[in-house]
Regions:
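Thiol-/selenol-based redox modules, centered on thioredoxin-like
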Residues: 140-168
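N-terminal targeting signals for export/organelle localization
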Residues: 1-39, 165
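Aromatic-flanked redox-active Cys/Sec active sites in thiol-based oxidoreductases
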Residues: 64-70
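A short beta-strand-turn-helix
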Residues: 39-61
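Hydrophobic beta-strand anchors of alpha/beta hydrolase catalytic cores
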Residues: 62-63, 95, 144
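Short, internal strand/loop/helix patches
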Residues: 108-145, 149
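Residue-level signal for well-ordered, solvent-exposed loop/turn and beta-edge residues enriched
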Residues: 33, 46-48, 152
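Structural microenvironment flanking redox-active thiols in thiol-disulfide oxidoreductases
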Residues: 74-114, 128-132
Length: 168
């Protein structure tokens, strides 16, 4: 009878611990990693025809990935853009904003409504199947990265308040 109790206790403990959620890696690149280079082509004639991340070495870069269907990433992108442009036009940070909307028209309407003024705002119409999405191992939550002048990630998922503090 004692063995049955011990077996029951062991089974109970093992079943309880199996329901505890383990820490999962958060995916994407991390602070200290070198940002993966990419090229993105814009469909708008008003913007640069191609943006190449490696050409921005020597500048600090705020790299923001978002989509209009993801309210949190959209709001974060707009607040980062506003924080960047309201602090000082001569700051040393350039923003590269990449949307994963599958339709150019939705992207353009979102940019207009959110009043994003960055000339380096691009859309990747392949969405989650794009090379950039895969290179950066992005998930549904999207993310942003602050890169130093050598392309090394110095902050991940930075808020507008943190960006403003950095710029001041």
């Amino acid at each position: 009878m004692k063995h049955v109790k011990w077996i029951f206790v062991v089974l109970l403990i093992s079943s309880l611990t199996s329901f505890v959620e383990k820490d999962k890696p958060t995916g994407g690149l991390n602070v200290g990693d070198i940002a993966t280079d990419f090229k993105i082509k814009t469909m708008s004639t008003e913007q640069q025809p191609i943006q190449n991340l490696s050409k921005m070495k020597g500048k600090y870069v705020l790299l923001s990935f978002w989509a209009s269907y993801d309210a949190q990433s959209r709001m974060q992108n707009a607040s980062l853009s506003n924080a960047l442009h309201s602090t000082s036009p001569n700051n040393n940070v350039e923003m590269v904003s990449v949307s994963f909307d599958e339709y150019q028209s939705i992207f353009e309407e979102t940019i207009r409504k959110d009043q994003i003024v960055t000339p380096t705002c691009f859309v990747e119409t392949k969405g989650e199947s794009s090379g950039i999405f895969k290179k950066y191992r992005l998930g549904r939550g999207f993310t942003n990265y602050l890169l130093d002048d050598n392309g090394v990630i110095i902050a991940k998922n930075i808020s507008a308040a943190e960006l403003s503090a950095y710029l001041n």
